[in-house]
């Protein structure tokens, strides 16, 4: 009765802990996205659990006979708009596109990943280190959680913290990053990072 003393974890762990194919896949993701060397698997399981919740909600709505009006229509629109704000879908996506989101799309929306994609850090590992040590801010809010899911409108105010040594544009690190950024220019728009292929042409790392 009443509220539980401790909140239950929403993260679902693998049903079979020793499947080699899954272990190899998760090790590859851990290296690609610069996750914790010890405990990085839990970060992947957390994203998979969140993805599973999005898919279950979408499948429930797709299975309805009529979602063109009423409560289910609003629920469908709310889900799509929510995922658009999170950068997992682009504007104009449909409820079917939710099923094409995968765990890499989820991992790419972590603050750590976006810091790297935005050219604020030379690697995923470096991005994690900079966030943990307080060198990254969203607006005036200093961020220290690499796994924070950044929203699309927050990307424009993502920057170095005001009290960080890297906030100085003449800092040697900033000079080197600018040179590196110029050599890594591509034709893809950075705001399309993390969007499902059904809604955009390419998935950019």
Where do the model's predicted regions map?
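Ferredoxin-like alpha/beta domains used as RNA- or RNAP-binding modules
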Residues: 1-118, 137, 141-205
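Beta-rich strand-turn-strand
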Residues: 121-125, 133
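DNA-binding alpha-helical recognition surfaces that contact promoter or target DNA
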Residues: 129
């Amino acid at each position: 009765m009443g509220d539980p003393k401790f909140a239950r974890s929403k993260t679902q762990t693998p049903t079979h802990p020793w499947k080699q194919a899954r272990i190899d896949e998760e090790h590859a993701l851990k290296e690609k996205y610069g996750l914790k060397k010890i405990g990085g698997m839990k970060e992947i399981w957390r994203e998979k659990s969140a993805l599973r919740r999005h898919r279950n909600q979408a499948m429930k709505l797709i299975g309805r006979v009529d979602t063109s009006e009423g409560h289910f229509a609003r629920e469908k629109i709310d889900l799509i708009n929510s995922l658009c704000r999170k950068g997992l879908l682009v504007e104009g996506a449909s409820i079917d596109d939710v099923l094409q989101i995968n765990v890499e799309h989820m991992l790419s929306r972590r603050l750590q990943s976006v810091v790297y994609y935005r050219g604020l850090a030379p690697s995923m590992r470096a991005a994690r280190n900079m966030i943990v040590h307080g060198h990254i801010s969203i607006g005036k809010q200093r961020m220290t959680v690499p796994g924070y899911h950044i929203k699309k409108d927050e990307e424009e105010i993502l920057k170095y913290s005001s009290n960080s040594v890297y906030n100085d544009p003449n800092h040697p690190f900033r000079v080197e990053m600018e040179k590196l950024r110029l050599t890594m220019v591509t034709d893809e728009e950075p705001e399309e990072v993390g969007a499902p292929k059904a809604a955009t042409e390419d998935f950019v790392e």
